[in-house]
A protein has these predicted regions:
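Metal-dependent amide/peptide-bond hydrolase catalytic core
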Residues: 1-147
Length: 147
């Protein structure tokens, strides 16, 4: 049975912005190879969640944050430039600036964006606020750069 109409959707996430071009081209090629001759096939390809691509400047800024955490708070701070899935809002900021953009330095917890399971670890509030303030101070006073 062939339905009168059908719709399909997909949420595509990529590691690099340039990967969208390749994927869109591949999907367009598949759409051209229509199996049902009288069918009307349309493709709407939207780039909704850009990836956050690491730069040398963002890596340097992350290392500075790790040093503050280790040297001043005696704690490790996980930071890497490996893709962690999802689509961070930080990626939108990185598309519009040449300054480094880093993420994953927010409050620790679990269940992000869930209706009834999200929580924050209270013990993470003070050190993360300290880190944020110190990063702003160090950038403002030239102790570290953002280029």
């Amino acid at each position: 049975m062939i339905p009168a109409s059908a719709t399909a959707g997909a949420d595509v996430r990529v590691l690099k912005v340039a990967d969208y071009d390749r994927i869109e081209q591949q999907v367009n090629e598949r759409v051209k190879k229509q199996l049902v001759p009288d069918a009307k096939v349309e493709l709407k390809f939207e780039r909704r969640r850009p990836p956050l691509e690491a730069t040398d400047a963002s890596r340097a800024l992350a290392k500075h944050a790790q040093a503050i955490y280790k040297d001043e708070l005696g704690r490790p701070l996980g930071a890497d430039d490996k893709a962690a899935g999802g689509g961070t809002d930080a990626a939108f900021a990185s598309l519009k600036t040449k300054a480094p953009v880093i993420e994953r330095f927010g409050l620790q917890g679990f269940g992000a964006h869930t209706a009834d399971a999200e929580y924050v670890l209270i013990d993470s509030i003070e050190p993360r606020l300290y880190l944020g303030v110190r990063m702003v101070m160090d950038i403002a006073t030239g102790k570290t750069t953002v280029r």
